Amino acid sequence: MSGCGCGSSCNCGDSCKCNKRSSGLSYSEMETKETKETVVLGFGPAKIHFDGAEMSVASKEEGCKCGDKCTCDPCNC
């Protein structure tokens, strides 16, 4: 999964601060060239890995995703 701490301290990973609900659950749609998947997180550790596939991740509310070199792309915290 992708996560961003927006601004000059952008970071990718589980510490994403964008679009966090108070329940700790998050909703994401993941697209590759061949498939589209919906992922609901918060019930256990998220470990998603695609080999050799281009992937984009965006939350339901157009939050943030990490782009090249750990940039927030886009980020609406």
Curated annotation (Swiss-Prot):
GO MF entry, a single one: metal ion binding
Tell me the InterPro entries matching this sequence.
Metalthion_15p
Q: Does the keyword Metal-binding apply?
A: yes
Keywords from the UniProt entry = Metal-binding, Metal-thiolate cluster
Q: Which Pfam families match?
A: Metallothio_2 (PF01439)
Q: Please give the family membership noted in the entry.
A: Belongs to the metallothionein superfamily. Type 15 family.
Known role: Metallothioneins have a high content of cysteine residues that bind various heavy metals.
Q: What is the protein name stated in its UniProt record?
A: Metallothionein-like protein 1A
| Lineage summary | Eukaryota, Viridiplantae, Streptophyta, Embryophyta, Tracheophyta
